[in-house]
Curated annotation (Swiss-Prot):
Keywords on record: Cell projection, Repeat, TPR repeat
UniProt cross-references to SUPFAM superfamilies, sorted A to Z: TPR-like
An individual GO BP term: positive regulation of smoothened signaling pathway
Subunit structure: Associated with the EvC complex composed of EFCAB7, IQCE, EVC2 and EVC.
Compartments, record wording: Cell projection, Cilium
Gene of this entry: TTC23
GO CC, alphabetical: cilium
Pfam families documented for this protein: TPR_12
PANTHER family the record matches: TETRATRICOPEPTIDE REPEAT PROTEIN 23 (PTHR14485:SF3)
Name the UniProt record assigns to this protein: Tetratricopeptide repeat protein 23
Length: 446
């Protein structure tokens, strides 16, 4: 009897404990649900704007775009169809579309809608509203960027000029402080530079890149990550103008900034690779050591991160081999090409442009050594893959076929210990197009 009472009391206590622990949880969930359902639209708008900024800062642009669409709908509910806040929401949405490839037209449409709203809504008291002026600057800048992406350079330049003039007027009237104006100027100057560079006018683009960098360094700091894309674009313009020392130095500066930001191995590799490529592009022997150093850094980072059997590693390794050929280190380049063949088959497929190109280069190397049998065998494999990929009338296929025709008519000559510069010049042109998977696995020993 006593045992039965104890059991009953124990069960009753369990029920009380469960009720105490579960009921508040249910109440909390209900409260959160009710709060979400009955949350004021302006509070929902604020939270959605914060989410959009968070997604954009972490480069999750599709999620950010979803929130920006939500923001525009909530802004219309909160402020109506004619308020400048709705124009601002359209501008922000246009910026979101610009982050996604192929969406420039949508960005332009939203920027134009914002312009339409501002044109019809700006009247007292809005005419004295600093926020409206800021929105107008962002509108003209964003519309300029959208037109730039659509390669409408003249219209883009007109809108960027409007943004520049308006921001200067705001500074003179005391509506913005100088630091804020410099941040705006940095973005506008960069867009102007891109307008000129898009038209291959590197000479006109150069001073705008330099001003954009100067304003960014002042407003954000010389070691800021915001300087990196500007330094890289500036380096490209300098390279196009033949200012190779300046180009290499700017890319090295960008690389050092990247390394300070604790990048991933792949990011560090990509940054080092850009320096190496700039050093090669100069065509000057004094830059060979720089190219060697940064190629090694790039490949070491990728090897540590993912191993040697990745598309990225093999692509950079091929660039390194071409550098070795340019500097007369043909035997080392050929050895690396030969060793990489099996990995390329595994990564790109048997019948891929990468495998075809490697067979072609190995065939050229054999030909330079006087090994006509080996050259014919490798070039034949290259021709088979090229015919499958590009067809028999493609210029790459025809070039390989022509080489084989000449080779088949030539008498066998003794193998030479060193490559012939003439042969290398005749047969060393080529690139690495996109990959196509295949089936049969060629032997790397061939």
């Amino acid at each position: 009897m006593q045992e039965s009472q104890e059991t009953h009391i124990s069960n009753h206590l369990d029920e009380i404990v469960a009720a105490v622990s579960i009921t508040p949880r249910k109440k909390l969930l209900n409260q959160l649900l009710q709060r979400a359902l009955f949350q004021p639209p302006r509070e929902k708008l604020r939270l959605s704007e914060e989410k959009a900024k968070s997604y954009a800062s972490s480069h999750e642009y599709k999620k950010a775009l979803h929130e920006l669409v939500h923001c525009m709908a909530l802004t219309r509910i909160c402020y109506g169809d004619s308020h400048w806040k709705l124009a601002e929401a359209h501008v922000n949405l246009a910026k979101g579309y610009l982050q996604l490839k192929g969406m420039s037209l949508r960005a332009k449409q939203h920027a134009e809608k914002a312009k339409e709203i501002l044109t019809s809504s700006v009247a007292p008291p809005y005419s004295d509203n600093t926020d409206v002026f800021k929105c107008s600057v962002e509108l003209f800048h964003t519309l300029g960027q959208a037109l730039l992406s659509l390669q409408k350079f003249k219209e883009a330049s007109k809108n960027l000029t409007k943004a520049e003039i308006l921001s200067k007027e705001m500074l003179q009237c005391g509506k913005i402080i100088k630091e804020e104006w410099m941040e705006i100027q940095a973005r506008i100057k960069l867009s102007f530079a891109q307008v000129y560079q898009g038209q291959k006018k590197s000479k006109e683009a150069l001073p705008h890149y330099q001003e954009a960098l100067e304003y960014t360094e002042i407003s954000r700091g010389e070691k800021s990550l915001e300087c990196v894309p500007i330094l890289r674009e500036l380096a490209a313009a300098e390279q196009a103008l033949g200012f190779h020392d300046a180009s290499i130095n700017n890319l090295i500066q960008a690389h050092l900034i990247v390394l300070r930001g604790s990048p991933s191995r792949e990011e560090a590799a990509t940054s080092a690779h850009s320096v190496a490529c700039a050093a090669i592009a100069s065509g000057r022997p004094e830059h060979h050591d720089v190219a060697e150093q940064y190629f090694q850094d790039s490949m070491a980072n990728l090897k540590d991160a993912e191993g040697k059997e990745t598309a990225k590693f093999l692509s950079i390794q091929d660039d390194y081999c071409h550098f070795l050929q340019v500097t007369g280190q043909d035997e080392k380049a050929t050895s690396i090409f030969r060793e990489s063949l099996e990995a390329k088959v595994a990564v790109f497929g048997d019948f891929s442009p990468e495998v075809a190109e490697t067979y072609r280069l190995l065939g050229v190397a054999d030909l330079a050594q006087g090994n006509q049998t080996g050259a014919h065998k490798k070039l034949k494999k290259c021709l088979q893959i090229q015919t499958l990929l590009y067809g028999p009338q493609d210029k790459r296929t025809l070039a390989t076929q022509q080489t084989m025709d000449i080779l088949s008519k030539a008498p066998e000559v003794p193998a030479r210990p060193r490559p012939s510069p003439g042969a290398k010049a005749a047969f060393c042109a080529g690139g690495r197009p996109y990959s196509v998977p295949g089936r049969t696995r060629p032997s790397a020993a061939d």
